[in-house]
A protein has these predicted regions:
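Long, well-ordered, tryptophan-enriched scaffold segments
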Residues: 1-185
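Gly/His-enriched, cation/cofactor- and phosphate-binding structural elements
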Residues: 90, 190-191
Length: 191
């Protein structure tokens, strides 16, 4: 659920940037480049949780995974997506590594939220939103997305068959079995 900057290039296209850090927000503190933000689902505010990389080298003993606001100690619930409070959508260019010399990037639609930083307004999204965009999950916001498992779109079961020789039906069946096992074991699934 960490926030990632979405940056506009000179040609007008958008690309994922780096994580939104404490330094971006103008905070002058030790290891500020490694204190990353999430959206707290309870308040809608952006906060730094315990356990970021900076805490590993900190003296404050907050190198843990408790869902707490690092600054206040208040309990937080990191929001997976900016979908519910998005200020818009943009199409991002994502690197494509699928053996196609003609196609080097994938264009995907992405929900974004505007955040005021020390250097002005920037667009952010979550790692989760980027993952969904990369895998062409159709969220009804446009872009190149897969309408079904049978679409020959990068990362779908139909697409992978030409690279692996594994039938799409088998991939779908296996994925459903893993998901079913995860439900039955409360997430204690190994692949």
């Amino acid at each position: 659920p960490f926030l990632v900057r979405v940056e506009k290039r000179a040609d007008g296209t958008y690309i994922p940037g780096r994580m939104l850090s404490s330094r971006d927000m103008g905070r002058d503190e030790k290891h500020a480049d490694f204190r990353y933000y999430v959206v707290d689902d309870k308040t809608g505010e952006i906060v730094i949780p315990n356990g970021t990389l900076a805490e590993r080298w900190s003296d404050q003993e907050k190198w843990n995974i408790r869902e707490e606001n690092r600054d206040t100690g208040a309990e937080i619930c990191p929001r997976l997506s900016v979908w519910d409070d998005k200020t818009g959508t943009v199409e991002v260019e994502l690197p494509y590594f699928g053996n196609d010399r003609e196609k080097r990037t994938l264009t995907r639609a992405l929900p974004v939220r505007s955040v005021q930083t020390a250097d002005g307004e920037v667009l952010v999204t979550t790692v989760y939103d980027l993952t969904l965009a990369n895998y062409a999950i159709d969220r009804g916001i446009g872009g190149e997305s897969a309408g079904s498992y049978e679409d020959d779109t990068p990362y779908t079961p139909a697409w992978q068959e030409k690279y692996t020789g594994i039938a799409p039906e088998l991939v779908i069946k296996t994925a459903r079995e893993i998901a079913d096992n995860a439900i039955k074991t409360n997430g204690r699934t190994m692949i």
